[in-house]
Amino acid sequence: YDDRWDRMTTWDFFKRRLVRLHPMVIMGTLLGASLFYFSACSAFPMVMQTPWWNVLLMTLLGCLMFPTPTSWDIRGWWETNALNGPTWSLMWEYIANVLYALFIRRFSKLALGIFVGLSACLTLDVTLNIDTFGLLSSRGEAAYTLIGGWSLTPGQLYIGISRLLYPFFMGLLLSRIGKLVKVKRGFYWCSLLVTVILVMPRIGGETSQWMNGVYEAVSVLALFPLIVAMGSNVTGKRSVALCKFLGELSYPLYITHFPLIYMQIAWARNNPDAPAGMHLFIAVSVFVLSIAIAYACLKLYDEPVREWLKQHWLMKKNTKTSK
């Protein structure tokens, strides 16, 4: 949005972001509510104890993107939205959008570079378990990782902020610099690199947990920005078409897939003696169904709703002005 501020007010920006993001927030929450009781298992001990009216209340709060405290949890994972966990990171994106519109868009490259360095220190503080502010002592198995950020507790809020700031400032700085790494078939190489990075299991044993912290820090601070720089210059016709499709699908997939994951976890807990082949079948089915639901939501709901909001809300001011 850096190149649009000469023809867009701050309120226009907020409306554009709401139109882009919020319809699927509502859809993801409604999907999570409809499948909530199908996720009952020992991993989610509170599900069957939750009355229907409480689910309806959480649905309303989720649709409004109102983060709930841990005392209001109805699942057992203390998420800000117990019906659709991934919205915790979207909450941070909303905050980043507000800060960008009010202040950060005016930052120079030097200022962005300084904030990149400062936010990198926060990333290192979490991944290496340095715990400068004394907020990470209760992380347990999540120590030396970036796992966390989805609860309204001091430690989780700190992890959430740490996970937000470096990618946000680094992404904005890369966009401002505009110098991309030109690699032939860069999209495919970048896809391979992302896959390799993400499939790596946790490294280091109980006495060498720091090794995993170093791996995650290097991945976030160096490898992911490099991949973005390498993959942002796609020119091939097929590559552009594939990128366009995946880009359109990514947000609906992100915001709708987790209710199915809850159900998969419940099935695995409730069927501990199921053969490996059945687990594989369930996993593949969840993968395929997640993509199908995301694509259906995109074409049948998200795009039509956004177009309607664009015509009746975003462009309403311009129409009145022209009249």
What label would you give each PLM region?
Residues 28, 32, 100, 290-298, ...:
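Alpha-helical transmembrane segments of multipass membrane proteins
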Residues 34, 117-131, 192-205, 264:
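Aromatic-anchored segments of alpha-helical transmembrane domains
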Residues 17, 21-25, 249-256:
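Loop-to-transmembrane-helix entry motif
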Residues 21-94, 123-154, 218-231:
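Membrane-interface helix-loop-helix regions
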Residues 12-13, 21, 89, 112-113:
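Alpha-helical transmembrane segments and their helix-entry boundary regions
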Residues 319-323:
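Intrinsic disorder in cytosolic terminal tails and internal cytosolic loops
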Residues 1-12, 68-78, 102-109, 146-295, ...:
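Alpha-helical transmembrane segments in multi-pass integral membrane proteins
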